[in-house]
Regions:
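Conserved glycine-rich beta-strand-loop-beta hairpin in the small C-terminal domain of fold type I
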Residues: 256
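Glycine/charged-rich beta-loop-alpha catalytic/anionic-binding loops adjacent to active sites
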Residues: 7-14, 53-64
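DPxDG-like acidic metal-binding loop motif
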Residues: 66-88
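Short linear Ser/Thr-Pro motifs
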Residues: 9, 59, 70-72, 221
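Short pre-catalytic strand/loop immediately N-terminal to key active-site residues, enriched for Gly-Thr
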Residues: 62-66, 244-247
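Short glycine/threonine-rich catalytic loop with a Thr-x-Gly-x-Asp
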Residues: 68-70, 247-252
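C-terminal nucleotide
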Residues: 1-49, 84-91, 97-109, 115-249, ...
């Protein structure tokens, strides 16, 4: 973004509730990691103790509002950098919890799924027990090597050309849940079951079965929040329906990226050509991606 700022007033550093502030994430990292208090205090006394601090972040080629969890991943990177700077050990739970705390401080909402998904390698099945303190269980899925290669070949990311802010969508989802909306409660229960079934199909090496479940997950997501899709997303999926075995949004939806499983013998170049023919000069495109 090429944005630079200097802060000599602690109140300005503590003001991190605007997610459009270029430095909101950096400020939240300082508060979440206990470098500065959430309110009050003296910046001079803090800098005298730690000798000042220069915090620089870079993120290349990923648009804002992508749905790929980049803000949570960048939050985790800030946490890890601060822990290392002060010579403190940093476990994976430390990363997850501090990143989630930062999101609450910035008022963007969210949970732990983005940081766990983005900062831990591999395909994972992530669960937590009920309660205010979220203790996570991260299980790495063992996918047979031939199936993993097939998934890499058939999996594609499509950018919609639209930006969305997850905070607004998440508030709608939480509101429907707290209001005991029957469709939302049913869909949330089914999504948990769907995730376990996806693990089963991946461990069997059944990519077609996984793709079918991805489609069901997409229908359930729309039951939870109609804002997860829009005219643009519907048109993109309609234009490439004959090329796909599975489709789903990334993140909260409403823009950002879409994830798809291509039919066998359909290449990403064929997908790209179809999108370019249908959507000219509007940012809709296939992005290169690799499973790690």
């Amino acid at each position: 973004m090429g944005t630079y700022g200097e802060f000599t007033d602690i109140a300005a550093l503590q003001d991190c509730h605007n997610p459009f502030d270029a430095f909101a994430l950096h400020k939240a990292a300082l508060i979440a990691c206990g470098i500065i208090p959430a309110e009050g205090g003296s910046l001079n006394s803090i800098t005298d103790r730690i000798g000042g601090l220069y915090l620089s972040t870079q993120m290349h080629n990923v648009p804002k509002g992508s749905g790929l969890g980049t803000s949570s991943i960048l939050a985790g990177a800030c946490v890890k950098a601060l822990f290392k700077y002060f010579g403190l050990p940093c476990t994976e739970p430390d990363l997850y919890n501090h990143a989630m705390c930062m999101e609450q401080i910035m008022s963007t909402g969210g949970g732990w799924q983005d940081q766990v998904g983005g900062m831990t390698e591999g395909i994972k099945y992530i669960t937590s027990a009920p309660g205010n303190r979220q203790i996570l269980s991260v299980r790495h899925i063992s996918v047979p090597e031939p199936a993993l290669r097939e998934l890499q070949e058939r999996f594609a990311l499509i950018y919609t050309g639209q930006r969305r802010l997850a905070r607004n969508l998440l508030r709608d989802v939480v509101g429907r849940y707290l209001g005991n909306n029957p469709d939302s409660l049913y869909a949330l229960e089914e999504i948990q079951r769907m995730a376990a079934m996806m693990v089963f199909e991946l461990e069997r090496g059944n990519i077609d079965g996984f793709a079918e479940l991805l489609n069901k997950h997409w229908e359930l997501s729309k039951m939870i929040d109609a804002g997860s899709t829009n005219t643009c997303i519907d048109q993109i999926f309609a234009a490439i329906e004959d090329l796909l075995d599975g489709k789903m949004i990334c993140g909260a939806g409403g823009g950002g990226f879409l994830q798809v499983i291509l039919k066998k013998n359909v290449t990403k170049e064929m997908l790209r050509e179809r999108l370019h023919e249908t959507f000219e000069d509007c940012g809709v495109d296939v992005w290169n991606c690799t499973l790690v």
